[in-house]
Amino acid sequence: MIVLFRQWLWRGLLLAACLPCLAMAASIQALNYSSREVDYIAVENPGNTNSGGGGDSIRPYGQGGSICCFSVPEKWHADLKVVVVYQLSPDPTFHRETVSIPPYPDGKGGDIWLIVYEDGSVGAVVSLYGPSRPEWPGKIKGYPVPTKEYRDERRKDKLKREKNTLDFLEKRLQRDFYTLSDEKIKEEKEIIEFQKKIVQSLEGNVR
């Protein structure tokens, strides 16, 4: 009886010791809180470059898609780390950063979220909940939102492109005017007028 009890106790201790090692499949999500394009972002286990998953690209202040799969422990432990592999445009360099995973919210495993911050640093969390939930363990709460400065720069860039298009259309009509039919000239003028409205609308939004 004592021998059986010792065997049962030993098995229980072994099982308890292995609990942190039990793994679960996790989808890979990515968030970009920066104004730079993320050309590539993926995740690996430390010391094992063949354990990677991901490879998404993300626009500035954007979110990547859900990519399968990566393995994470069912239970969080204090030395849990992953390696984030990433490339930020226009720099062609691939960076590898080992980051610590904070405690799982509610003690539950979930997707692994790779995060790029405004200063170019990276992080990762494992969470069953998204960034808009109060349980979200990330440093920044909520999904990425473009800054006013970034939105203004995008408008200026778009205005410049639309002005270049208008200039091209006007010069093309001037160049080909005497070779076009009346119907084609009318059509070209309508296109130019429409393009002018686009430019005027953008000029009203750019300060």
Spans of features found by a protein language model:
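Beta-strand-rich domain onsets/edges
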Residues: 19-26
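Bacterial N-terminal signal peptides that target proteins for export
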Residues: 2-13
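General secretory precursor processing signal
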Residues: 21, 33, 71-72
